[in-house]
């Protein structure tokens, strides 16, 4: 497969942080580029809530020699004490697109995970001439009831951060972190599958180590937007697309992800066995192989532990 790379990125081989000025502020964006000629279109990685540009170390090791990576830390959708300045999905989509302008990337593939999926979806829907391939994991038309309830709880906690239920001390933060992880992951599956349990533990440790209330941070980052039309009407056409989910995912179920895939013309839908919502962490090698095969346009039938179907 012949693809057009980015000369600008090739001139910045290795791993670099860039400042992306956007509107009245700016945000950091990590690029990881192998040395050599610009032969592959970059992959724009849109992380889920509470992830950063440094959350993809394993993925980088698996794929950075194959294609350039662009991993923005998009601005939080909500700023503490400044609810009136909340950003919308359209704003975040514009911010992500702006990074490609600043880095002089004309065409790119998109990987959207969890709450990064609504941004990736909108990019493909509105810019099919620029998005070469679309991959979404952990996608849902609307948040599951438990997650919606937890987001509402976070909004109430944010409204009065000095309330008795605010996670002010380390024990409170740990309790809030456990509550969040228990909703975002399948705790029953974690008891049977060590890789799922280990991924949940990594996220829990990261949340508990933060000085912020994990639930309020999740709401600010993008969580509250999940209550506001994450899946826009109109569908996606003209962009080769893949939607994937772990079979044990209870945050965005197999049915949820299939419903999103059904809005994308000709999408490939994959269910990865022995995986949960954090499948890119739990099954990092298999996840990277899947992404590389799809980006290269190679058959996915060689993948083990996956079921594959094609949407009409």
Where are these regions (language model features)?
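Flexible "cap/lid" loop of the alpha/beta hydrolase fold
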Residues: 125, 132-168
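Catalytic histidine-centered segment of alpha/beta-hydrolase-like enzymes
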Residues: 269, 275-288
């Amino acid at each position: 497969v012949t693809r057009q790379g980015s000369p600008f990125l090739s001139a910045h081989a290795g791993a670099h942080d860039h400042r992306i000025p956007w509107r009245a502020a700016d945000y950091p964006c990590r690029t990881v580029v192998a040395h050599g000629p610009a032969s592959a279109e970059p992959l724009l990685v849109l992380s889920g809530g509470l992830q950063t540009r440094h959350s993809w170390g394993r993925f980088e090791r698996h794929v950075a020699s194959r294609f350039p990576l662009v991993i923005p830390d998009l601005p939080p959708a909500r700023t503490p004490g400044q609810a009136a300045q909340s950003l919308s999905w359209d704003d975040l989509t514009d911010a992500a697109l702006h990074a490609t302008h600043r880095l002089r990337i004309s065409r790119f593939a998109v990987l959207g995970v969890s709450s990064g999926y609504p941004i990736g979806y909108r990019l493909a829907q509105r810019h099919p001439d620029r998005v070469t391939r679309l991959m979404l994991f952990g996608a849902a038309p609307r948040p599951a009831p438990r997650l919606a309830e937890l987001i509402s709880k976070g909004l109430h906690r944010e409204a009065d951060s000095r309330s008795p239920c605010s996670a002010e001390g380390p024990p409170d933060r740990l309790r809030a972190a456990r509550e969040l992880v228990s909703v975002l992951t399948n705790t029953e599956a974690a008891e049977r599958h060590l890789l799922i349990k280990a991924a949940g533990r990594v996220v829990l440790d990261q949340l508990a180590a933060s000085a912020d209330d994990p639930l309020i941070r999740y709401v600010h980052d993008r969580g509250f937007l999940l209550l506001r039309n994450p899946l826009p009407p109109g569908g996606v056409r003209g962009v080769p697309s893949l939607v994937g989910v772990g079979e044990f995912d209870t945050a965005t179920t197999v049915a949820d992800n299939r419903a999103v895939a059904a809005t994308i013309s000709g999408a490939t839908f994959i269910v990865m066995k022995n995986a949960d919502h954090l499948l890119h962490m739990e099954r990092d090698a298999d996840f990277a192989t899947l992404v590389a095969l799809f980006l290269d346009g190679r058959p996915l039938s060689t993948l083990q532990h996956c079921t594959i179907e094609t949407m009409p």
